[in-house]
Amino acid sequence: MVSLLRRTFSEEIKEELVNVPFGSREEVISELLGFIKARGDLDVKSRHIVFSLHSFAASRRLLNLMKYLSKPVSEIIVEKSHNIKKRYIKITAEYSESFMVIEPFFDVALFVSFLRGLFLSGGSMTNPRYHYHLEINLFEEETLALTRKSLKDFFNINAGIIELRNTRKLYIKSIKDILVFLEAIGVQRKLEEIDRIVTERKVIGDVNRTVNFIEANAIRTANSTARQIRAIELIKENMGLENLPEDLRRVALVRLRNKELSLRELGKKLNLTKSQIYSKLKRIIKIAERFGDVK
């Protein structure tokens, strides 16, 4: 059965959540309520709920919840599609009004269980190697708003909301908030992996920024040196270096002979500071601009 669905980063998280120990009966019902709000379809006449799940891990957890609550499951179907991503598991179970009596938004233990059910049934997380994004699909606007508020109140997690044509999504972009969310719903092993990935990305990002800075600085230096050489050549061709003031002539000659040296290194040769060399080269460029474009 597992081979029918692609194993994603989200599925690996959900596989870990399958084994989170059950708490009180109220917490179990709260988790089941999360499944109902995200992927449940109530048939009032037959008093059954039909769950349509895209995760086999979530399906196993749901079956365990129903077993704990002694609610029989009447049907389990794996729906097939031409698109492998659209395959899902359909589970029909007996409905009880007690499922809807629980209020999970005012007690942190109940809310955590509710969140676990939401994420297992309607949530996903992208692989943090690429970018940071966790989202949960929800249809009810009121449930979405209450979930967002409780995330802020209980865990100081900032969640956003986006409305699409057929559904609404609650999403979290901050990796810090994502880690708090996952830890709250019971993820442990995957948290360590995510921490390592985040650290690696930070190191790589720091290295890339340093390399980019060095490259940009090298390009600026090369362009500046080329401009200085061009200016000196223009003066040499049009008025002769010998007609420059002595201090400028000395700088021009040393620059021509040492095109690879930095301003600081040129200054050492002439017993001048870097700023003095820079100032004299600017004067040379200004003189050269009389004879042509110095770029």
Swiss-Prot record:
Residues 262-293 bind DNA. It comes from the Bacteria. InterPro entries: Homing_endonucl, Sporu_reg_WhiA_N_dom, Sporulation_regulator_WhiA, Sporulation_regulator_WhiA_C, WhiA_LAGLIDADG_dom. GO terms for biological process: cell division; regulation of sporulation. Keywords: Cell cycle, Cell division, DNA-binding. GO terms for molecular function: DNA binding. Contains a degenerated N-terminal LAGLIDADG homing endonuclease (LHE) domain, a linker region and a C-terminal helix-turn-helix (HTH) domain. PANTHER family: CELL DIVISION PROTEIN WHIA-RELATED (PTHR37307:SF1). NCBIfam families: DNA_bind_WhiA (TIGR00647). Involved in cell division and chromosome segregation. Belongs to the WhiA family. This is Probable cell division protein WhiA. The gene is whiA.
